[in-house]
Regions:
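Extracellular attachment/recognition segments
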Residues: 74-127
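Beta-rich globular "head" domains
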Residues: 44-92, 146-151
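Noncatalytic modules at the cell exterior or secretory-pathway interfaces
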Residues: 122-136, 141
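Short, surface-exposed beta-strand/loop "edge" segments at domain boundaries and coil↔beta transitions
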Residues: 35-37, 68-79, 111, 136-145
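Short amphipathic beta-strand and strand-loop transition segments with alternating hydrophobic
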Residues: 49-52, 66, 115-123, 133
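Periodic small-residue-enriched repeat registers in elongated scaffold domains
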Residues: 1-44, 146-151
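C-terminal interaction-tip segments
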Residues: 138-159
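Hydrophobic beta-strand residues in large extracellular and virion-surface proteins
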Residues: 2, 64-66, 130-132
């Protein structure tokens, strides 16, 4: 789901300064499975290959709600879970260098452990993207599900 942010060209109240930008918000569902302690990038709808595409010269605020459900494994306990909320932002410059800042991280509920979760750069040379990167213990089978809300400002000014 994507919601647009109005006019492309916006000015201050006196029209002394006008800037061209796109503003939008979106909610994306990411999911995936881990069976060992390998760091894993969640994919859009769990398709195994799609991440969240990004534009340069942008600021993206993110709000992640993520659930980790243990489903077994030799070291896992089926039914253990964690539910967390992580908020932050990423600055993406003209060359697609990304600077991530976490402003808030909270454990909402859990039985067992949390695992780890961060927003990460998943770019290739031809497609620039981000995703939620997750990791837990070896020999634990987990189903991960994340609802990610983004607030994007994409500027035509280079930085």
């Amino acid at each position: 789901v994507i919601s647009g942010g109005g006019q492309k060209s916006i000015s201050d109240s006196t029209s002394a300064a006008t800037f061209n930008s796109r503003r939008q918000s979106s909610t994306i569902e990411l999911s995936g499975v881990t069976i060992d302690n390998t760091a894993t990038n969640l994919t859009v709808q769990g398709d195994g290959s799609s991440f969240i595409n990004v534009k340069n010269n942008s600021i993206i605020g993110y709000d992640i709600y993520i659930t980790r459900l243990e489903l077994g494994g030799s070291s896992g306990s089926a039914g253990n879970y964690s539910y967390r909320n992580i908020r932050g932002a990423v600055q993406i410059d003209d060359s697609y260098n990304m600077a991530f800042v976490v402003g808030f991280s909270r454990n909402i509920a859990k039985i067992g452990v949390n695992g780890t979760c961060i927003m990460a750069d998943t770019s290739t040379s031809s497609l620039k993207s981000i995703s939620v990167n997750v990791q837990d213990r070896n020999n634990v089978h987990n189903l991960w599900s994340a609802s990610v809300t983004l607030h994007e400002v994409i500027s035509e000014t280079t930085f």
